[in-house]
């Protein structure tokens, strides 16, 4: 059922505001929220203000960035590949980005500067994206895309496990496990400022592909005959996905299934148009990541469950449902 864009945008903004407030308010320590908000105005560094501004605020912002970027990348991949099962983690891009980060840590490059790990992650995400799009152009059918993605993911996972096995540095092992699980627990404003510009730039490339994705529903040959620039469309999706997924994974690790599930939630409300799905998926995905992170904080566990673990637990049944639906 399609909705009025203004009503939909207003509704989503309200939900995001409520979710952000809940994320700032909810935690293991109860704080006086409004006192913490105004404390910096008086130059006071109260415990509540430190918890709010130094811990929960960057965590909330990172949740929004993670959801926004992964949601847009997932919608872009599904629209371009015309495959509802496509998603950065499913097609191997997230695993490749994590491998880049793991290699940077395991080989000691991360010790030379703060930007080596993101650079490695972005580079590997770009290579995986290029390989996926290149091999997809020769695929016999759309299901071959998933098989190719499984191959990329398996290869990346194998090298990641190899690095974990060969590493003799316990600190490096802990970091590698962090990338494999995905978490926003220890993020800071530095991580937010490092990932936000790249996600924004990647989103620019993906949004440029919105009109082309609509034309692509007519078929590649028909779309090209009426003005769609298929090579440019492929390049925009490639660069956009690599930038968004690579920058996010370089900071928080692998957070899967966000980009898979959210486009399916949005699609019925936008008449199943790929371009509109690409536009409306990011804020909904950001909301889902916020809710997931809030759920993690509410669970009565000795230590917090990693965000990537929870999204995988919630997303895997949905993925299996989609696979069974495709077979039917």
What annotation goes with each model-predicted range?
Residues 1-328:
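Alpha-helical transmembrane segments in inner-membrane proteins
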């Amino acid at each position: 059922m399609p909705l009025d864009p203004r009503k939909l945008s207003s509704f989503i903004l309200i939900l995001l505001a409520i979710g952000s407030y809940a994320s700032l308010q909810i935690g293991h320590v109860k704080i006086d929220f409004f006192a913490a908000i105004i404390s910096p105005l008086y130059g006071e560094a109260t415990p509540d203000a430190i918890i709010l501004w130094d811990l929960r605020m960057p965590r909330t912002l990172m949740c929004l960035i993670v959801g926004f970027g992964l949601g847009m990348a997932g919608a872009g991949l599904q629209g371009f590949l015309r495959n509802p099962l496509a998603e950065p983690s499913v097609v191997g891009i997230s695993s490749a980005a994590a491998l880049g980060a793991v290699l940077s840590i395991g080989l000691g490059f991360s010790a030379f500067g703060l930007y080596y790990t993101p650079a490695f992650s972005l580079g590997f995400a770009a290579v995986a994206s290029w390989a996926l799009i290149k091999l997809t152009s020769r695929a016999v059918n759309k299901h071959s895309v998933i098989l190719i993605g499984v191959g990329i993911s398996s290869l990346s996972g194998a090298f990641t496990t190899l690095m974990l096995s060969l590493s003799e540095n316990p600190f490096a092992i802990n970091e590698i496990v962090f990338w494999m699980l995905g978490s926003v627990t220890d993020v800071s404003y530095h991580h937010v400022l490092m990932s936000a510009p790249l996600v924004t730039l990647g989103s620019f490339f993906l949004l440029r592909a919105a009109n082309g994705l609509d034309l692509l529903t007519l078929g590649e040959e028909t779309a090209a005959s009426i003005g769609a620039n298929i090579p440019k469309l492929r390049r925009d999706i490639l660069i956009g996905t690599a930038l968004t997924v690579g920058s996010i994974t370089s900071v928080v690790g692998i957070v899967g299934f966000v980009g898979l599930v959210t486009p399916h939630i949005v699609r019925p409300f936008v008449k199943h148009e790929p371009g509109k799905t690409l536009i409306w998926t990011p804020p909904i995905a950001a909301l889902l990541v916020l809710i997931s992170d809030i759920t993690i904080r509410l669970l009565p566990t000795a230590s917090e469950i990693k965000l990537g673990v929870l999204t995988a637990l919630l997303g895997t049944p949905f993925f299996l449902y989609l696979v069974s639906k495709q077979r039917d």
